[in-house]
């Protein structure tokens, strides 16, 4: 057992110091075309130490967790911070916050690490069986879970201990007919294994049926259209195009279309964008970020007006802003500004009302990735499938649908959001780090270029 009181004393160096101690366990199962390719378990422990001296950071990590090693790391980080300060060209100010003492758990109803590996394997196999069809030529299913025990302490007096689990499952298939290849995919996950048990069967069938539907799809028309984005694609747009542009580190690097726009209108009155780490059970939720700041509900855009950026303690200090609890890190990496669960606030429309009111347009569903330039404010996404809207009804299934345009232009042209609410699960990459996130909202109607 570590002597945490001793470690707290060791942190009394420089102007600020913090330590993250992680104990982790992970499990992975992968299946490809009916055969289990991998069943593995792993354990990983580690320590990350940051020390601030004037305007210089020192940061070190180790996979050895012992009091002797921790003392060495703190001393090394302190020396590095002093050297870094000599070459620093910017002032570093950490936003003040009240010290926290807490011990918490975020595990869900069923701890995935308590579920027998045989039960997990049977669910993987059952998923595969429900995705089979004579036109389905390839199926892959993967499952992973992680359990982590974390200890976080800072020289300002916080000591936070937590236990967290997450599990996620991906299912993918490829359908083929007369040389035509189409793709279907779904995913589910959360803090508890119940998210897998409750959802995997329906999602397996949906992935299969989507691939089969797309075999009969016609190419999507190109041009400027009134479009409805489903919650998944709307969420990807909000996350990638709006959420990243609201991250304060990108703003400070002059790499955001939202720079110098606080208090200004950046979208229509129907656009309210929220980042919320407190949603119970959502994949991107957390009690505290990796700087010990409590996770919060942050309104980024309210009725079209840009209200705030997302912050770490350092960016909040530099911009004299309120803390938002978005300093996150993957494993032992440095905390940087990251989203949690980011979504567009639901509106008043039902989907049926919105469809009937649209008359002519295109309904875009799902996301197959894309590109965003947050500095120039440009984006391009690919939808998984689409439908032609004629006389307020969904008619022809469409394939090869893309969405592109200017971020602000799309936001200003939003004129309706449905009242249903969905959050997708996944991981977001930035600066070589991947963290769990959620994104979504309701269906969104706007005008965009379909490409």
Curated annotation (Swiss-Prot):
Pfam families: PmbA_TldD_1st, PmbA_TldD_2nd, PmbA_TldD_3rd. Its EC number is 3.4.-.-. Probable metalloprotease. It comes from the Archaea. It is an enzyme of class 3 (hydrolase). GO terms for molecular function: metallopeptidase activity. This is Metalloprotease MJ0996. InterPro entries: Metalloprtase-TldD/E_C, Metalloprtase-TldD/E_cen_dom, Metalloprtase-TldD/E_N, Peptidase_U62_metallo, TldD, TldD/PmbA_N, TldD/PmbA_sf. GO terms for biological process: proteolysis. Keywords: Hydrolase, Metalloprotease, Protease. One of its GO terms (cellular component) is cytosol. Belongs to the peptidase U62 family.
């Amino acid at each position: 057992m570590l002597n945490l009181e001793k470690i707290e004393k060791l942190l009394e160096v420089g102007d600020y110091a913090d330590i993250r101690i992680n104990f982790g366990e992970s499990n992975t199962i992968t299946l490809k075309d009916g055969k289990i390719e991998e069943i593995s378990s792993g354990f990983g422990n580690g320590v990350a130490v940051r020390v601030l001296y004037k305007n210089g950071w020192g940061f070190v990590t180790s996979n050895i967790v012992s009091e002797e090693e921790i003392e060495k790391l703190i001393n090394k980080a302190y020396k590095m911070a002093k050297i870094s300060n000599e070459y620093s060209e910017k002032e570093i100010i950490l936003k003040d916050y009240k010290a926290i003492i807490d011990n918490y758990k975020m595990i869900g109803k069923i701890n995935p690490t308590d579920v027998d590996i045989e039960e997990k394997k049977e669910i993987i196999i059952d998923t595969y069986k429900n995705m089979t069809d004579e036109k389905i030529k390839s199926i892959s299913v993967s499952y992973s879970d992680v359990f982590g025990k974390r200890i976080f302490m800072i020289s300002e007096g916080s000591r936070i201990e937590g236990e967290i689990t997450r599990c996620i499952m991906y299912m993918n298939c490829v359908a083929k007919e007369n040389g035509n290849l189409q793709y279907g995919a779904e995913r589910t996950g959360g803090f508890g294994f119940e998210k897998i048990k409750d959802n995997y069967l329906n999602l397996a069938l949906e992935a299969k049926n989507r691939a089969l539907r797309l075999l009969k799809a016609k190419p999507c028309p190109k041009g400027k259209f009134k479009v409805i984005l489903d919650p998944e694609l709307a969420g990807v747009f909000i996350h990638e195009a709006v959420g990243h542009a609201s991250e304060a580190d990108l703003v400070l690097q002059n790499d955001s279309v939202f720079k110098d726009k606080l208090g200004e209108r950046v979208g229509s009155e129907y656009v309210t964008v929220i980042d919320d780490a407190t949603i119970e059970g959502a994949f991107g939720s957390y009690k505290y970020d990796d700087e010990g700041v409590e996770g919060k509900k942050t309104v980024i855009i309210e009725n079209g007006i840009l209200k705030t950026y997302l912050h770490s303690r350092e960016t909040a200090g530099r911009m004299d802003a309120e803390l938002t609890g978005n300093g996150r890190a993957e494993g032992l990496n440095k905390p940087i500004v990251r989203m949690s669960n980011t979504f567009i606030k639901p509106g008043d429309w039902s989907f049926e009302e919105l469809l009937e009111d649209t008359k002519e347009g295109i309904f875009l569903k799902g996301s197959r990735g894309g590109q965003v330039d947050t500095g120039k404010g440009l984006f391009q996404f690919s939808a998984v499938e689409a439908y032609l809207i004629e006389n307020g009804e969904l008619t022809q299934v469409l394939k090869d649908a893309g969405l592109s345009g200017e971020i602000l232009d799309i936001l200003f042209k939003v004129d309706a959001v449905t009242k249903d609410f969905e959050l997708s699960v996944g991981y977001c990459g930035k600066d070589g780090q991947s963290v769990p996130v959620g994104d979504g909202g309701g269906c969104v109607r706007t005008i965009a270029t379909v490409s």
